[in-house]
UniProtKB/Swiss-Prot annotation:
Subunit structure: Component of the eukaryotic translation initiation factor 3 (eIF-3) complex.
Keyword flag Nucleotidyltransferase: no
Entry function: Component of the eukaryotic translation initiation factor 3 (eIF-3) complex, which is involved in protein synthesis of a specialized repertoire of mRNAs and, together with other initiation factors, stimulates binding of mRNA and methionyl-tRNAi to the 40S ribosome. The eIF-3 complex specifically targets and initiates translation of a subset of mRNAs involved in cell proliferation.
An example molecular function term from Gene Ontology annotations: translation initiation factor activity
Compartments where found: Cytoplasm
Annotated Gene Ontology cellular component terms: eukaryotic 43S preinitiation complex; eukaryotic 48S preinitiation complex; eukaryotic translation initiation factor 3 complex
Protein name as annotated: Eukaryotic translation initiation factor 3 subunit K
Classification via InterPro entries: ARM-type_fold, CSN8_PSD8_EIF3K, eIF3k, PCI_dom, Transl_init_fac_sub12_N_euk, WH-like_DNA-bd_sf, WH_DNA-bd_sf
Length: 249
């Protein structure tokens, strides 16, 4: 059973009190939420509900918006893909920051903040579409990306784990070279350590197609046939025939 959207096991009591009271609409609480974002970045936690509350305050009070806090929230949202977290956060930002053309093109092009938002949106698209090798290539292609993820402790490791989770849902066996690219692990030793210690998977070096990584069977990657049957009672045909005569009349 999934966790409720507005719940977070690591949420401090004072943040929970704000979210469940009228103070969540008080502009003075923005500094409290901003400090909480810093805490999430340092402690590798993510509280989507609290972050959305802060972005909503920014929406109502644009003069309070802190670009660095916003980019940190979006960067943290990347570490919990696949989920609607990034899209929900993005939807609360000003229209000129959105990753599509706007009427105010000049303003969009001249803003470092807007460029940062659009670069993060690009990373989100690559992750959500399972273009993992392209994600790492893009992330490593520009120093701005390094600056954007610098405040988020363990960003690469967190994303790597999420990618591994998705791979585990779709594969029972995968070529080691492919997985190296998807996880951006640039040596076979690093890959073997990650998949065995973090994922508890197996490495088979004696396969006919080279080294492969074997994923244990789970409810997502297990191949099984599904037979569906529907029972149609006689009374259902009676209703259909009766309606046909009623419409004709």
């Amino acid at each position: 059973m999934g966790v409720a959207f507005d719940k977070c096991d690591t949420r401090p009591a004072h943040i929970d009190a704000i979210l469940n009271g009228l103070d969540r609409y008080n502009p003075e609480t923005t500094t409290v939420f901003q400090d909480y974002v810093v805490q999430q970045c340092e402690e590798r936690t993510f509280d989507c509900y609290a972050n959305l509350a802060l972005l909503k305050l920014y929406q109502f009070n644009p003069h309070l918006l802190q670009p660095e806090t916003v980019t940190n929230i979006l960067t943290k949202a990347l570490t919990v893909f696949p989920s609607p977290a990034f899209s929900l956060c993005l939807a609360l930002l000003p229209a000129h920051t959105q990753p599509f053309p706007t009427a105010d093109t000049d303003a969009s092009q001249s803003s470092d903040f807007v460029e940062s938002i659009q670069k993060l949106a690009r990373l989100s698209t690559l992750l959500e579409s399972a273009q993992y090798a392209q994600f790492w290539s893009t992330l490593n292609s520009d120093d701005l990306y390094a600056d954007l993820v610098a405040d988020v402790a363990g960003f690469e490791e967190l994303v790597r784990i999420r990618i591994a989770i998705e791979v585990g849902k779709a594969f029972r066996e995968i070529n080691a070279e492919v997985l190296e690219q998807w996880l951006d692990l640039r040596s076979r030793e690093a890959l073997e350590k990650f998949v065995t210690e973090v994922c508890s998977w197996e490495v088979d070096k004696a396969g006919p197609n080279g080294t492969v990584v074997k994923v244990p069977t789970n409810k997502e990657n297990e191949a099984r046939s599904e037979v569906k049957s529907e029972r149609v009672g006689v009374e259902m045909f009676g209703r259909v025939i009766r309606r046909g005569f009623e419409q004709a009349a």
